[in-house]
C-alpha cells in the first residue's frame, strides 16, 4: 500500500509545480493542435477536391444515363410503397385492430341476464385471439413505420428537386443598349446610379402580390410615387442620356435537372398519394412517364434545338451575303496625275489600309483651288459638291391639312 501511495505522489508531483500550480504538458497540447489542424485541412482539401471533380463533370451529357434512370427508379419505389400500404398494410390494420372498446365481458348489464351470457363468452374468445395477434404484429408494425419513413424521405427529395428546378435556376442579363422595354414579364428596370431604386413599371408587370407589397411599402411616399409614374411615361430618345437600363432574368435549368424533374415528377407522386393504388394503377404511372418524356424532350427540347439551328443558319446567311463581301473587298488607293503637261498621265497605286471608302473625292483645279466631287452611280459621272462648308440642319416640314 505504501508503494502505491508513493507512486501516486510521484505522479501528482509530475503534474504540479512546487508552488502548487497545475503544470500543462506543452508537447502533448501541440501534438493535439497539429492533429486537429491536419484533420481540418484534410477535410477542407477533400471538400475542395470533390467540388472541383463535380464541377468538371458534364452533367448534361449524363441526363439519359443517370438522371432519367434515377428518377424512374424513385417513382417506381414510391409506387411500390403506396401499393403495399393500400393492399397489405390496410388489411393488416383492419384484421388486427384492437377490440377492447367492444369488450362485452366487462358489461355488468349483460351479466345480469342469463340469456345474454353467450355474447359475453364470444367477446372473451375474441379478446384472447386479439391478444395473441398483438404479440405477432411486431414485424408488420415496424415494416409499416419503415415504409412511412421511406415515403417521407422520397417526398422531401422530390420537394427539394422541384424547388431547385423551378426557383433556383436563373441567369441575369443586363440589356444596356435597349431603348424600349421588351415585352416580357422577366424584364425589370434598374437604375444605373441607385441600386435600391424601384420603378412603377416593374410593379405593373409583376404579380398581384408584388403590387400589394409595393404599395404597402410606399404608402407614405405618394408624392414620390406620382413623380415616378410621370417619369415612367416619358421616354428618352438618346440611349446615352438614360439613367436606367433593363435587366432580363432568364429561367435556364440544366438539361440534367430537367430530365430528373420529368422522370421524378411531383404530379405523379401527388396522384399516387390521393388515389387508391392497385396493380392497374401502374398503367397510369407508365403512361405519365412516357407522356412527360415525349412532351418535354422529344417535343419542347427538340423545338429549342431546331430554333437554334434556324438562327445559326440565318446568321451564316447574313455573314455570307452582307458582312463578308463588305469586309473582304480588295481595294487600293490610287493617285492620278491630271496635269495637262504632256499626253501621258501617270497613275500610282498604294495598298489600302481600310475597307471603308468615302464617296467624296478631293482634287485641285489649274488655279490650285480645292474641289470636292462625288460619284453618282445613276449617271456614272463625278459631280461637284457645293456648299460643303455649310453646317447641316435637320429641318422637318409639316404640311398643314
Curated annotation (Swiss-Prot):
A UniProt-annotated Pfam family: DUF2418
Transmembrane segment boundaries: 146-166, 256-274
GO biological process: maintenance of rDNA; regulation of exit from mitosis
Entry keyword set: Membrane, Nucleus, Transmembrane, Transmembrane helix
Record keyword Nucleotidyltransferase present: no
Membrane topology: Multi-pass membrane protein
Compartments, as annotated in UniProt: Nucleus membrane
GO CC annotations, alphabetized: nuclear membrane
InterPro entries on file: Nur1/Mug154
Function description: Member of a perinuclear network that controls recombination at multiple loci to maintain genome stability. Required for rDNA repeat stability.
Family, similarity comment: Belongs to the NUR1 family.
Protein name per Swiss-Prot or TrEMBL: Nuclear rim protein 1
Organism: Vanderwaltozyma polyspora (strain ATCC 22028 / DSM 70294 / BCRC 21397 / CBS 2163 / NBRC 10782 / NRRL Y-8283 / UCD 57-17) (Kluyveromyces polysporus)
Upper taxonomic lineage: Eukaryota, Fungi, Dikarya, Ascomycota, Saccharomycotina
Amino acid at each position: 500500500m505504501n508503494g502505491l501511495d508513493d507512486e501516486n505522489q510521484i505522479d501528482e508531483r509530475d503534474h504540479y509545480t512546487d508552488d502548487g500550480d497545475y503544470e500543462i504538458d506543452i508537447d502533448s497540447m501541440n501534438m493535439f493542435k497539429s492533429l486537429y489542424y491536419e484533420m481540418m485541412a484534410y477535410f477542407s482539401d477533400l471538400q475542395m477536391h470533390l467540388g472541383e471533380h463535380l464541377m468538371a463533370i458534364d452533367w448534361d451529357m449524363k441526363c439519359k444515363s443517370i438522371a432519367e434512370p434515377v428518377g424512374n427508379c424513385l417513382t417506381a419505389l414510391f409506387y411500390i410503397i403506396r401499393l403495399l400500404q393500400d393492399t397489405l398494410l390496410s388489411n393488416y390494420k383492419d384484421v388486427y385492430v384492437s377490440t377492447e372498446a367492444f369488450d362485452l365481458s366487462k358489461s355488468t348489464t349483460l351479466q345480469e341476464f342469463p340469456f345474454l351470457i353467450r355474447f359475453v363468452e364470444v367477446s372473451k374468445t375474441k379478446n384472447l385471439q386479439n391478444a395473441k395477434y398483438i404479440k405477432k404484429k411486431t414485424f408488420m408494425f415496424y415494416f409499416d413505420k419503415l415504409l412511412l419513413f421511406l415515403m417521407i424521405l422520397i417526398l422531401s427529395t422530390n420537394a427539394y428537386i422541384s424547388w431547385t428546378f423551378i426557383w433556383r435556376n436563373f441567369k441575369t442579363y443586363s440589356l444596356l443598349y435597349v431603348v424600349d422595354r421588351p415585352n416580357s414579364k422577366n424584364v425589370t428596370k434598374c437604375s444605373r446610379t441607385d441600386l435600391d431604386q424601384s420603378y412603377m413599371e416593374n410593379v405593373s408587370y409583376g404579380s398581384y402580390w408584388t403590387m400589394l407589397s409595393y404599395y404597402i411599402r410606399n404608402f407614405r411616399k405618394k408624392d414620390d410615387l406620382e413623380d415616378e409614374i410621370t417619369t415612367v411615361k416619358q421616354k428618352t430618345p438618346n440611349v446615352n442620356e438614360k439613367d436606367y437600363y433593363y435587366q432580363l432574368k432568364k429561367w435556364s435549368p440544366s438539361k440534367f435537372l430537367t430530365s430528373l424533374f420529368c422522370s421524378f415528377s411531383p404530379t405523379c407522386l401527388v396522384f399516387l398519394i390521393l388515389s387508391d393504388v392497385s396493380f392497374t394503377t401502374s398503367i397510369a404511372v407508365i403512361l405519365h412517364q412516357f407522356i412527360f418524356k415525349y412532351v418535354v424532350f422529344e417535343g419542347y427540347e427538340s423545338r429549342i434545338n431546331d430554333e437554334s439551328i434556324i438562327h445559326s443558319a440565318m446568321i451564316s446567311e447574313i455573314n455570307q451575303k452582307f458582312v463578308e463581301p463588305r469586309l473582304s473587298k480588295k481595294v487600293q488607293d490610287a493617285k492620278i496625275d491630271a496635269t495637262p503637261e504632256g499626253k501621258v498621265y501617270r497613275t500610282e497605286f498604294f495598298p489600302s489600309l481600310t475597307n471603308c471608302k468615302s464617296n467624296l473625292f478631293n482634287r485641285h483645279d489649274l488655279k490650285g483651288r480645292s474641289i470636292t466631287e462625288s460619284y453618282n452611280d445613276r449617271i456614272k459621272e463625278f459631280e461637284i459638291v457645293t456648299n460643303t462648308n455649310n453646317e447641316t440642319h435637320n429641318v422637318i416640314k409639316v404640311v398643314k391639312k
